[in-house]
Amino acid sequence: MQAIKCVVVGDGAVGKTCLLISYTTNAFPGEYIPTVFDNYSANVMVDAKPINLGLWDTAGQEDYDRLRPLSYPQTDVFLICFSLVNPASFENVRAKWYPEVRHHCPSTPIILVGTKLDLRDDKNTIEKLRDKKLAPITYPQGLAMAKEIGAVKYLECSALTQKGLKTVFDEAIRSVLCPVLQPKSKRKCALL
């Protein structure tokens, strides 16, 4: 069985842990718990191939900036996550997460993931953002960011409703099984 290592990065509280727990257990967790490193492993079938998907959670908080890259070696695919209802987390894709991932892993495929899709149309959430003169991130904005950072895909999902959730991980696996660019290199992340 082929093993694939998928590392999930992004700002604190964008929903990385919920994404993983909801996907691996089919249940949405309750309270917000900051993460250091939780690893999940799931055996899945994608395109009739059995895959052992190793899912690595990371902490987005700045306190972990020096620890986090320790989980990057041998990564096959990165999910860079931001919350669709947190414009600052979206900006940090460009300002922090893309540069960090590319510094350590120059050619590992990236999938850009907009989380909390269920809240984009939530009246209370929209009002709170409007009070700060902000708005939820739109699909075209996400697509443009994915293009800018050279992500292989842009996907949106909700860990709460599970809409688009399975697709995120299926596409992560496909990006490794059917690489779009540089098929000759092994595309593994190395620590120099």
From Swiss-Prot:
Positions of post-translational Cysteine methyl ester modification: 189
Lipidated positions per record (S-geranylgeranyl cysteine): 189
Protein name, UniProt field: Ras-related protein Rac1
Propeptide intervals in chain numbering: 190-192
UniProt family annotation: Belongs to the small GTPase superfamily. Rho family.
Record keyword Membrane present: yes
The organism's taxonomic lineage, starting at the top: Eukaryota, Metazoa, Ecdysozoa, Arthropoda, Hexapoda
GO molecular-function terms, A-Z: GTP binding; GTPase activating protein binding; GTPase activity; protein kinase activator activity; protein kinase binding
Membrane topology label: Lipid-anchor
InterPro entries to which the protein is assigned, alphabetical: P-loop_NTPase, Small_GTP-bd, Small_GTPase, Small_GTPase_Rho
Functional summary from the UniProt entry: During various developmental processes, regulates changes in cell morphology in response to extracellular signals. During oogenesis, mediates signaling from the tyrosine kinase (RTK) chemoattractant receptors (Egfr and Pvr) to the guidance pathway that control the directional persistent collective migration of the border cell (BC) cluster through the nurse cells to the oocyte. Once activating by Pvr and Egfr, promotes the formation of forward-directed actin protrusions which stabilize the DE-cadherin (shg)-mediated adhesions.
Superkingdom of origin organism: Eukaryota
UniProt note on tissues of expression: Detected in oocyte border cells (BC), with increased expression at the front of the BC cluster.
Natural source organism: Drosophila melanogaster (Fruit fly)
Record has Protein biosynthesis as a keyword: no
Effector region, short sequence motif: residues: 32-40
Chief place of localization: membrane
GO cellular component terms attached to this protein's record: cell projection; cytoplasm; cytoplasmic vesicle; cytoskeleton; cytosol; plasma membrane; rhabdomere; ruffle
Record GO biological process: actin cytoskeleton organization; actin filament bundle assembly; actin filament organization; axon extension; axon guidance; axon midline choice point recognition; axonal fasciculation; border follicle cell migration
Keywords of this entry: Cell membrane, Developmental protein, GTP-binding, Lipoprotein, Membrane, Methylation, Nucleotide-binding, Phagocytosis, Prenylation
Compartments reported by the entry: Cell membrane
Residues annotated as binding GTP: 10-17, 57-61, 115-118
Oligomeric form and interacting partners: Interacts with Cyfip. Interacts (via REM 1 repeats) with Pkn (via N-terminus). When GTP-bound, interacts with Pak.
